[in-house]
Each structure stands twice: as C-alpha cells, then as structure tokens.
Amino acid sequence: MSLPDAAALLQAAVSGLLLGAMFALAALGLSLVVGIIRIVNLLHGEQVVLGAYLTYLLLGMSGLNPLLLAPLAALLVAALSYPIERWLLQPVRRFGEEVPLLTTFALSVVVQNLLVYGFGGNTRVLDSGLGAARLLVGGVSIPTVELLGTLIAVLVCAAVQVLITRTAFGRAVRASAEDPTAAAVLGVPVRRLHAVTYALAGGVSALGGALLGMVFSFTPSSSVEYLLTGFAVVVLGGLGSVAGTLIGGLGLGLVESLSAAFFGDGYRLFTALLAFLLFLMLRPQGLFGRRA
C-alpha cells in the first residue's frame, strides 16, 4: 500500500468536508426526531434514500435538473412523513418507548421492499447535468456538484437553526421537547408540533439524500448505510443540535475521505464507523452534549 502524498491528502480533506456537509443535512432529520420527539426513528434511512429515488423519478418524468427537483422530492417526503407521525407513531407512543421503535423498523422494511418492487435493486445515480465540471482552487479540484450540494446543505441547516431558535414555532417546539405535559397545559399543540417536526425532519433528510444521490450511487439497501451514518453524525454532534450535527457531519466526511485515500473506497464506511465507536466510548454525550 502506497501512502498518499500531501496533495492527495489535501484533496481528500476538501472532498471530505464538502461531502460532510451533505451528510449533516441528511442526518439533521434524525437529530430533530430523536432530540425533540424522543423517538429513535429507524425509518430515517428510507426517508433519505426516498429523496434520491423520488428525484430520480421526477427527473425521468420532466427531464429537469435534479438540483431543481430535489426540493420537490423533499416536500413529497415531508408530506408522507406527517401522517406517519400523527396517525401511526403518536397512537402507539403510550405503550412505551419500544413500540414506536418497532413501528419505525416495520415501516422501514415496508418502504425498502416497496422501493425494490418499484425501482428494482439496480444501482442508480442522479445525473446533475454538470458532468465533470470542476473548480481548481490552489491545486485542489472541487467538483461543481459537490460544491453546490454543500452550499445548499449549509444554507438549509442555517435556516433550520433560525427556525428552531429564533421563531415562535421554534420556541413552542423546544417547550414541547423539554416537557410535553406542561407545554400542553399552557396551550401548546404538542401533537401537531410533533407531526410537523417529523415532516420537517423527513423533508431535510430527503433533500440530503437527493444531494448525496448526485455524488454516490444508491440502491434501496443504501438506507442502512444512511441510517448508520446518521446515528454516527447525531452522536458526534449531540441530540437536537443543528450546529453540532453540521460539525459532526463534517468530521465524519473528513474521516471517510481520508480513510478512502489511505485504504481505498471499500474501507470508507468501516473506518468511519470504527472512529465513531471510539468517539462514543470516549465522549458518549457528543461534542456539544453535557454529562448527566
């Protein structure tokens, strides 16, 4: 095995940071659901990959650039996510924490099989229409599609941060997360807010999946990888923290790209999850969490 030179390491680091922002956007939905609704959402991976597949479907129907179609796919996933939380997850929550977990697992199996039935198991990728267009900055080659995806991811993360921290909706959501019973007594529509939050989470996850689908190929089983990387990003950044999720995504992307530079693409996910497990042992509360 030959070690990469300094230029290759710099190229890998920049690529990792760009991809990490898209990882963060895809994982942000999981962070919102776990941090606010307090549900471990095993359907998250399917929501991410569904964003890529719906964009693929819309691309085949319209021929438009997938960068324009990705927000529409995200809205469709958000619209599908709202009734799932409102009419499937909320009724079973009173039976304990395990039942919503099992419900999302069952839904993930159903959705993955529907994707196999509808699209087959063949590998697909979204053609951004940008081809091999790149920017050359200081000797580093930056694919245009990755740069645009990163800009979109950062802007959406910033918008969600403002929504959660600076608006009346965000204050109500935070109140419902801290003490749902007290918030309901004060007139906060907790159930509706949880459903809207789950829809928002599904939408941003799907948008992240569509952006990643322009960089990586995907199949219905890619949902498992997205779920694992989502948990890694959320634990790294801390539950419910938008800034933490973004930094966690950047860190994970950096580890994946550098491991690919050293060991090859086949070890990308393995090395990232190994680093995640080591971090989990050393700092289980995440970068921005506090010890209980």
Model-derived regions, located:
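Cytosolic-side transmembrane-helix boundaries in multi-pass membrane proteins
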Residues: A8, G118, E178-V185, P189-R192, ...
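Transmembrane helix-bundle core of multi-pass membrane transporters
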Residues: P91-R166, L193-V196, L258, F263, ...
